Amino acid sequence: LMGGYFSEYQGFDKDISLAISEQYLPIGLNSIVPKKPFSVTLSITDKIDTLVGFFGINEQPTSSKDPLALRRIALGIIRTIIENRKNLKINDLLNYSSRLYDDQGYNLENKDLQKELQDFLKDRFRYYLKDKEIRYDIIEATLSSFSLNNLFSSFEKAKCLNKVINTQIGIDINSCLLYTSPSPRDVIQ
């Protein structure tokens, strides 16, 4: 927050100062997310850099501990993307961020970095969908065709299915699909 005030005082553009102020948003599950383009960009790239850096040195949350708030950071990425109604190529950002570490001479120890980050973000997306009261079977179907490059689209599909599934039309469609569809993945696509 203070960085935004300092940058404005030093004559930086208001959008840049706002982005600096909002780079750590959202700070919790129900707090606001940045909305302006510079703010969204800085917030997401800062969080991606943080995740790549910590996962790169094998500092990951355990099932009971997350002292670096990496789960909150991942949810911040997910919420910022979804609430701004964007599909970003998160896999490309993860790759680019890890290459920047290499370019600067930092040897990231974790050889499974990309896969672990993808799994971690997928798990956080599962948590986000549960928090939005999406049915378990719809969450699993959504995750079966999931890509980090289409978080917003995946969320919209899950939300739509969740809304329709208990209507008469949804019940009828579900009955038909039980006999014709080989897997939940075919339904969600």
List the predicted regions and their residue ranges:
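Single conserved hydrophobic/aromatic residue that forms the stacking wall/gate
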Residues: 179-189
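Amphipathic alpha-helical "coupling" segments that flank catalytic cores
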Residues: 1-181
